[in-house]
């Protein structure tokens, strides 16, 4: 059973911002934002043709500045946010804005993708998330499974909850929280939990992970030294409401039950340099991707702490034969965690990895040299999970 070869796409500029087009669940589509100091920056819309194993792309201009973070609306596939660098009065500020793609590009129905590089169209600015009072933006998070009307931005040591009004043409801060403490505190990453009616947020600053209740904008837990060095990324298990994964500059990936934060549930040490990105599969939470500046992407099968630690359980009522019943009991040993694959198509630091929103077995990774690689979960594992 041979697996399909990875598909590689090269951008002409350096890049570190990647997202799946969240609201698009029919086509496999990723958005990549570039980082160029000399030229106008771009957003590449990458369409993956699964049947022919090939990529179609279109390019939109993002002349506001180099892109550090990109995120797609969960409700409107034409709408996205970027965090980008802007120089003003000899200092660099990372700003954030909400944009709309031109109507003919949002659905990927462009006729001749090659022409778009020569005459790229510009994104339509819907509104700025005005951060002049709060400092540089680290990221913008859309409300999971929301209607595209609420976003959170992390700016320096502030959590800002925004309401987007009138087709996202205006953004107002509805509530905020500030991280208090010694020194210059600064958020590095955050994740809006899809559980608890989307009322919780996890943030990372320095080596700590904090949980926030968005109703009261107050802190609900703090894992003080979650990692030995800076925490780079977080992700919530989509199927287990208290479980959270984190990664950092100590080369480790850790799994937490936020009800018992004194120590991690599990720890992985497979990377040899900083781990920049960690992502749970949206459907099968045993599958976990990590990306690192050791230039590798690792797919792990963390089945023991997944929502199905025994695989698919068969109901005892379905087994009429007592002998079969005994054998079934023997088979109910927890399955073993393992590293499934190490993907080594990159030659530079891999800053981002994302699962497709349309195909649960497919993912993209992006390295700083502008190389985007599309890979799949090995077929043997896919069928083992499904059957």
Curated annotation (Swiss-Prot):
Where, subcellularly, is it found? Golgi apparatus, trans-Golgi network
Keyword Repeat assigned to the entry: answer is: yes
Its GO biological process annotations read: endocytic recycling; protein ubiquitination
Which InterPro entries does the protein's record reference? EIPR1, WD40/YVTN_repeat-like_dom_sf, WD40_repeat_CS, WD40_repeat_dom_sf, WD40_rpt
WD repeats: which residues? 132-172, 182-222, 226-266, 270-310, 345-385
Question: What job does this protein perform?
Answer: May act as a component of endosomal retrieval machinery that is involved in protein transport from early endosomes to either recycling endosomes or the trans-Golgi network.
Report the principal subcellular site.
Golgi
Entry GO CC: Golgi apparatus
Tell me the name of the encoding gene: eipr1
Which species is this UniProt entry from?
Answer: Danio rerio (Zebrafish)
> What is the protein's given name?
EARP-interacting protein homolog
Q: What is the lineage of its organism?
A: Eukaryota, Metazoa, Chordata, Craniata, Vertebrata
């Amino acid at each position: 059973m041979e697996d399909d070869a990875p598909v590689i796409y090269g951008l002409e500029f350096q890049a570190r911002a990647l997202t799946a087009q969240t609201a698009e669940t029919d086509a496999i589509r990723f958005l990549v934002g570039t980082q160029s100091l000399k030229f106008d920056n771009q957003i590449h819309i990458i369409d993956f043709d699964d049947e022919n194993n090939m990529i179609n792309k279109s390019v939109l201009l993002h002349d506001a500045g180099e892109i550090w973070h990109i995120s797609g609306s969960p409700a409107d596939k034409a709408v996205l946010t970027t965090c980008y660098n802007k120089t003003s009065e000899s200092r660099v500020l990372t700003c954030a804005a909400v944009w709309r793609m031109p109507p003919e590009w949002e659905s990927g129905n462009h006729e001749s993708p090659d022409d778009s590089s020569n005459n790229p169209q510009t994104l339509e600015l819907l509104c700025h998330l005005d951060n002049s009072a709060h400092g540089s933006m680290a990221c913008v998070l859309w409300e999971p499974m929301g209607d595209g009307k609420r976003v959170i931005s992390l700016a320096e040591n502030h959590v800002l909850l925004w309401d987007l009004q009138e087709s996202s043409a205006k953004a107002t801060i509805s509530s905020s929280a500030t991280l208090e403490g010694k020194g210059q505190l600064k958020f590095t990453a955050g994740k809006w939990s899809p559980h608890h009616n989307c009322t919780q947020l996890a943030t990372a600053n320095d080596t700590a992970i904090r949980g926030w209740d968005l109703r009261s904008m107050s802190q609900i837990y703090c894992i003080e030294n979650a990692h030995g060095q800076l925490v780079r990324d977080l992700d919530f298990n989509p199927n287990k409401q208290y479980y959270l994964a984190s990664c950092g500059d100590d080369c480790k990936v850790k799994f937490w039950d936020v009800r018992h934060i004194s120590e991690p549930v599990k720890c992985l040490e497979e990377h040899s340099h900083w781990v920049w990105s960690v992502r749970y599969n949206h459907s099968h939470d045993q599958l976990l991707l990590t990306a690192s500046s050791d230039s590798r992407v690792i797919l792990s099968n963390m089945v023991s702490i997944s929502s199905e630690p025994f695989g698919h359980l068969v109901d005892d009522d379905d087994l009429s034969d007592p002998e079969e019943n005994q054998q079934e009991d023997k088979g109910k040993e927890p399955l073993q965690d393992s590293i499934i694959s190490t993907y080594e198509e990159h030659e530079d630091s891999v800053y981002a990895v994302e699962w497709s929103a349309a195909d649960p077995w497919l993912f993209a990774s992006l390295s700083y040299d502008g190389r985007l690689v599309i890979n799949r979960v090995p077929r043997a594992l896919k069928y083992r999970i499904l059957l």
